[in-house]
Amino acid sequence: TRERIRAIAKQHQFRINIPARRLSLQQSNTIAFVTHAYHKEFSVADLFGLEIMGGISSGLSENGYDMLVVHVDPRETEWAHMYLDTGRVDGFILMTSTRKSDHIQALVEMEAPFIVWGPPKPGMKYCSVCGDNLSGGRLATEHLIQSGRRRIAFLGGPAEELEVQYRFDGYQQALQDAGRSLDSALIAHGDFTDTSGAVAMRTLLEQAPDLDAVFINSDLMAIEALKELRRHGRRVPEDVAVVSYDDLSIAAHSNPPLTTIRQNVPLAGKLLAQNLLQYLQTGVVTNTTMPVELIVRESA
């Protein structure tokens, strides 16, 4: 059986030679973009994924590949065998998160060709592309310090996510360099969704009503956080300055337009595609960190 063959291969520490495998199998010239089946309709909450998907599609098509969007149950891992063993796809592109760590572990163990958006998990070897989250956190916080803000809050994504931890480290370093100490009342977390931005902003206003700035870990969370600030009678940027993250297409069209850390999401998608195809050809694992930049608009 398939499981018995895998067990024997593992026992003898058999390693798949990716380029050789490509020669021995008929290739589908299709790459799977893996999303979670939390809901069936796309919405504004999917904007980051949609924009990175556009870059992936562009990078694949330039190299004669198609993209297949695969919705999977976040608790299941057998989907990878189904798509790879039947030759439907040649590899996978994933958006990393702690909810997907089982997926990454399973793909590493079956030695499937894949690449992940997000910082690589320590001790695991696989291809990845991520933004420079530490620099992003520093840039955002330094901008708020330089604009004269004293009580700068951090509104993060999930605290267990590596990219959020790196952004927090950048925030903390910038505060320390300015001779300021951390205040736990100025720290709250959402989950990168728009609605969580409003909830976390409300929490911050309750914990630290004197805050005069906030660094928010995504444009989506920032959009709803702006509305929450208005509901509390706070003007942006006069009363509270806001710097967000990603520079998605909506950032320039919010009210007010968001000052944000640009990750160049479409380029990230293109790099994910190109680096995975390079891995399929060479078997060489790459971990790419993309530079980020501060885009100044009207919110800070």
Predicted segments — roles?
Residues 38-50, 69-77, 129-139, 155-202, ...:
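Hinge/beta->alpha junction and helix N-cap segments in small-molecule ligand-binding domains
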Residues 1-29:
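N-terminal helix-turn-helix DNA-binding module of bacterial transcription factors
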Residues 202-300:
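Flexible loop/turn connectors
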Residues 151, 182-186, 236-242:
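Short acidic capping loops at alpha-helix termini that bridge into adjacent secondary structure
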Residues 26-142, 204-206, 210, 220:
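Alpha-helical recognition/docking segments in bacterial nutrient-uptake
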Residues 11-17, 72-77, 226:
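Short gly/ser/thr-rich secondary-structure transition/capping motifs
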